[in-house]
Amino acid sequence: MARSLKKSPFVANHLLKKIEKLNMKGGKEIIVTWSRASTIIPTMIGHTIAIHNGKEHLPIYITDRMVGHKLGEFAPTLTFRGHARNDNRSRR
């Protein structure tokens, strides 16, 4: 279900403050966050944000095509290890 248009997109306050501070001084450093639910807004373009996937922080470079998506969409939490092996030798 989409968010109402009369509401602004959700961005965690601590993340927004860090991005605004970096935009003011023009710095380029990695921002570490656990806020996977935050929406990517145009002020984030050009920054590298390390998003937590449950185990580690994955650095993601924000581009203009990512605006409107959530941060968690770019840090997968599950790793596919393959389907179960068909072990015919043990059945004999």
Swiss-Prot record:
GO biological process terms held by the UniProt record: ribosomal small subunit assembly; translation
Single GO molecular function: structural constituent of ribosome
GO cellular component, one term: mitochondrial small ribosomal subunit
Subcellular location(s) of the protein: Plastid, Chloroplast
InterPro entries hit by this protein: Ribosomal_uS19 (IPR002222), Ribosomal_uS19_bac-type (IPR005732), Ribosomal_uS19_CS (IPR020934), Ribosomal_uS19_SF (IPR023575)
Alphabetized SUPFAM superfamilies for the sequence: Ribosomal protein S19
Keywords: Chloroplast, Plastid, Ribonucleoprotein, Ribosomal protein, RNA-binding, rRNA-binding
UniProt cross-references to Pfam families, sorted A to Z: Ribosomal_S19
Gene3D superfamilies given in the database record: 30s Ribosomal Protein S19, Chain A
Main localization (coarse): plastid
NCBIfam families for the chain: rpsS_bact (TIGR01050)
Family: Belongs to the universal ribosomal protein uS19 family.
Role description: Protein S19 forms a complex with S13 that binds strongly to the 16S ribosomal RNA.
Protein name: Small ribosomal subunit protein uS19c
Biological source species: Piper cenocladum
